[in-house]
Amino acid sequence: MPFRDLILFNLSKFLLTEDKESLEIVSSLCRGFEISYDDLITYFPDRKYHKYIYKVFEHVDLSEELSMEFHDTTLRDLVYLKLYKYSKCIRPCYKLGDNLKGIVVIKDRNIYIREANDDLIEYLLKEYTPQIYTYSNEHVPIAGSKLILCGFSQVTFMAYTTSHITTNKKVDVLVSKKCIDKLVDPINYQILQNLFDKGSGTINKILRKIFYSVTGGQTP
C-alpha cells in the first residue's frame, strides 16, 4: 500500500474532523518519509486547508510504531468521512395533504401500507386503484421502490439513496451508525461505488481514489 495514500487518508480525516490521532499519524509519516509542507499542498491546493496542514509540521508528539497498511475499518472510515456533515432534505409534495399519516411502499404494482390513517388509505385508493394495483400484507422491499412518507421528519440515508421518496412535509436525511454499517456490507458495493463517484473537490477526489484502492476497483 503506497505510504502516500496513508498520508492522504489520515490528512483528509484530520482536515474534516480535526482528529488528533490522524494528525499524529500524518506528522509521523511525513517526518519518516521526508514529506514537506510544499509536497502536501500540491495535493490540497485550496488555501482553506493550508493553515491546518501547517499544523502537521508543528506537531511534536510522534508515533513510535506505525502500520503501513490500512486497518480493517478503513472502508467504514471512508464512508463516514464521505458522509461527514452530510446535509440533505426532501421537500414536500403539496399534492399530499398535511392530514395524511403513514408509510407506503410501491414497487411495480405491489403496495405495502404501514401505520396509515384513514385519510392516507382514502388517497391511495383514489390514486392507485385496486383494479390495477395489489395491496399486499407482505413487506415490499424498499430498494427500487416508490416510498410515500406522511407525517415523518426524518428518513435514513439508505432509504433515500435506494428509493424514490415523496413526502407531505420537509424530511431530513439521516446518516446513522446503523446506516453506515449497512452501506459497508458487500451486497451494497454498487451503492458505495455510486456514492464515491459523485462529488468534486480535493477531499472527495482523494477519498474516491482510496476507496477504489481499498476495494480493489479501478478509479474512473
Swiss-Prot record:
Key words of the record: Early protein, Elongation factor, Protein biosynthesis
InterPro entries: Chordopox_G2
Domain of life: Viruses
Functional description taken from the UniProt entry: Involved in postreplicative transcription elongation on intermediate and late genes.
Family per similarity comment: Belongs to the orthopoxvirus OPG087 family.
Subunit structure, as described in the record: Interacts with H5 and A18. Might be part of a transcription complex composed at least of OPG087, OPG145, and OPG110.
Full protein name: Late transcription elongation factor OPG087
Species of provenance: Variola virus (isolate Human/India/Ind3/1967) (VARV)
Upper taxonomic lineage: Viruses, Varidnaviria, Bamfordvirae, Nucleocytoviricota, Pokkesviricetes
Gene for this chain: OPG087
